[in-house]
Amino acid sequence: MGTGIRATSSGQASTIQVNRPLFSELWKNYPVKMAAPDVYQTFGGQAFALYQENPTGYANACALRLSKALNYGGMPIKQTTKGYKVKGKDNKPYLLRVKEMISFVENNLGKADITLRPKNNEDVSSQLSNKKGIIIFKVSGWGDATGHVTLWNGNDCGDSCYFVHHQQGVTTTEVLFWNLK
């Protein structure tokens, strides 16, 4: 899971381990193409209770899906992780908001390896062909979310992709991508 980087300064050398989860482990633990109500029910616990109380307010489950993949795929979310978290029936913490998932990923993996800024609803998916990793779409114009987080397998997203929008006034302003082996 780790990659070593060797840094040298003033005659001193040190190796820094950069740890990233394996894509195959995240994908194996990601609820691929599972509808949001089913995601909440499967995860249970506090997450499902909140969904049952307010299905409209908790209609988006993308951060919950990615939280599961991270929790079981080698980059667990800790109780001390900043952000709005809830517990699933497995007693693990899950992030529910895209904004907080972006912070979590950046804090653990650094800035995105690739940042794309589509113009005029341009489909930039070809620039990620044959790459695998975590993908985040920052979206303008949605009333209930600031974006979408998911996994990209080189051809498609684990649930939904938002490279192009067919809804008036909705655009993807930025695509952030972290490459995983």
Predicted regions mapped to residue ranges:
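Detector for Asparagine
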Residues: 19, 29, 54, 60, ...
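N-terminal capping segments
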Residues: 2-89
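Generic detector of leucine side chains in alpha-helical contexts
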Residues: 22, 26, 50, 64-66, ...
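Active-site or metal-binding loop neighborhoods of secreted/extracellular toxin and effector enzymes
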Residues: 1-18, 135-181
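...with weaker cross-activation on analogous glycine-rich loops/strands in unrelated enzymes
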Residues: 86-162
